[in-house]
């Protein structure tokens, strides 16, 4: 017998499940370019789509790793047998994915690269991938003992209103270094795409589009036709105007 729960509890339970699933996959697949997860619930089963830049590593040899992840999710969240299925989807343009860029910056800093050089590298790569704007913030003990924050920006970036929900992709990561923990925040502003492939379909509300004027058809003056002499005042009548005037032999 299924238990009935209110809509409020259902939304809260779905949110907690998504947050915990995202946390588990972030820890498991951080090195494989994990870029988010999507959950689709159907009457027959629950489909979990994992987005990553290196899908071959997510699948593993002969699909071994994806089966292990399926078993882990099934046991952790108490799904019935064969009721959950995991899929791997490749990120088309990782330069426009904030999560992928935050992870990339994290591994650059762990590798010992200078903060300024690593941030400018991410900034350049994002802008070359077709983004409208990018912002990278790194905060913590960067050089001295006192913590501070460094911000790197390029392009156009909106910070309020509905466009922030549609155009801005953001990600936050933390990296543990010898001097302490650094916080990484990456924001990518997508460009408008009428097809909705690389950006949102809805244009920005403050963008004015000036359409080119339509080409008007050329209007030609009517051709002037000589009027017959009968219609012209003070003109002599001829046999052409009145055939009855033609003399009969």
Swiss-Prot record:
Keywords: Phosphoprotein, Ribonucleoprotein, Ribosomal protein, RNA-binding. Belongs to the universal ribosomal protein uS3 family. Pfam families: KH_2 (PF07650), Ribosomal_S3_C (PF00189). PROSITE patterns: KH_TYPE_2 (PS50823). The keyword Transit peptide does not apply. This is Small ribosomal subunit protein uS3y. GO terms for molecular function: mRNA binding; structural constituent of ribosome. It comes from Arabidopsis thaliana. PANTHER family: 30S/40S RIBOSOMAL PROTEIN S3, SMALL RIBOSOMAL SUBUNIT PROTEIN US3X-RELATED. GO terms for cellular component: cytosol; cytosolic ribosome; cytosolic small ribosomal subunit; plasmodesma. GO terms for biological process: translation. The modification Phosphoserine is found at residue 212. The gene is RPS3B. Residues 21-92 form the KH type-2 domain.
